[in-house]
Design a protein with these regions (language model features):
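Conserved catalytic or regulatory cores that recognize and/or transform ribose-phosphate-containing ligands
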Residues: 1-108
């Protein structure tokens, strides 16, 4: 799983898009290492869009945290983020691996 800031720092659409692009680039690198990459934001955004209502808080973190419980490891990217920190906490509590750089991510 890739955990990184998405909404931290405001609702600037360009910033969110740049952050999501960074997560997706990391996901490609993890895929090339032989793992199946997962990004909570990528799972939640289509559901949020389909709702056609303000369900961001209802959907984003519950989906991301549920995914965290089903993944084997997490790559924590970027700066401060309460959501990403919550995801990492799930991994830590479960005794799963937490990586902070791609350089330390093992081949699958």
């Amino acid at each position: 799983m890739i955990a990184a800031p998405y909404t931290s720092g405001g609702a600037d659409a360009a910033l969110r898009a740049a952050r999501l692009a960074e997560m997706n680039r990391a996901a490609l690198a993890i895929l090339r290492l032989g793992h199946v990459p997962v990004i909570g934001v990528n799972m939640a955004l289509p559901i949020i869009a389909a709702a056609q209502a303000d369900v961001f808080d209802e959907v984003m973190m519950p989906i991301s945290l549920a995914l965290a419980e089903r993944c084997d490891a997490v790559l924590r990217l970027g700066g401060p983020s309460q959501g990403a920190d919550q995801e990492v906490a799930r991994f830590t509590q479960a005794g799963k691996q937490v990586f902070h750089t791609l350089a330390g991510y093992p081949p699958g």
